[in-house]
Amino acid sequence: MTLQTFKSTDFEVFTVDGLEERMSAIKTNIHPKLEALGEQFAAYLSKQTDENFFYHVAKHARRKVNPPNDTWVAFSTNKRGYKMLPHFQIGLWGTHAFIYFGLIYECPQKVETAHAFLEHLNDLKTNIPNDFVWSIDHTKPSVKLHKTLETEDLQKMIERLATVKKAELLVGIHISPEEFSAMTNEQFLAKIESTMQSLLPLYALCNR
């Protein structure tokens, strides 16, 4: 693995003021790395699942005033988009890098997926690594650490996915800038791979 990934200074892109200025910095410094990660891990996911995965780098095209606070590359089995499907993400906030699997509010499979997750609730509680985190809103950086959740807490988040129209549910890891600076390029790529490996059983539940 010789792919050049993020640097610890890349987190600082989100301190750039102004929409045009920040977008220019993201396109120059971050997007080429997301494209490279996209190519590598779309191929990895395709191999692991025997499905064709495509990558989608966030364009932030709807933003007219406020600059983005995060950016990412997403992976789905649709060449045209990812928001309507269960998908994987690799990205950055100013406070952390993230690697996720999940469903966001546009996905029509939320009810069926929630039911599948609930059928395997105890397995999810046991098998998700303790240092993984859960997010119920991809637009906010706040998360809940898996090891702090009771089974009932996890059940409520999954039930919410089925019953609340705008509900979302994502799970994965956060890596702080400090942790990131101590990692080699190869260690970060290996971390992405191992995280996706841990999340693939959830993807399988979405497609049973």
UniProtKB/Swiss-Prot annotation:
- The UniProt transmembrane annotation reads none
- Report the leader peptide range: none
Task: State the superkingdom.
Answer: Bacteria
In Pfam terms, one family for this protein is DUF1054
Q: Which InterPro entries match?
A: UPF0637, UPF0637_domain_sf
Which family does the record claim for this protein?
Answer: Belongs to the UPF0637 family.
- Protein name per UniProt: UPF0637 protein BA_4170/GBAA_4170/BAS3872
Q: Lineage from the top down?
A: Bacteria, Bacillati, Bacillota, Bacilli, Bacillales
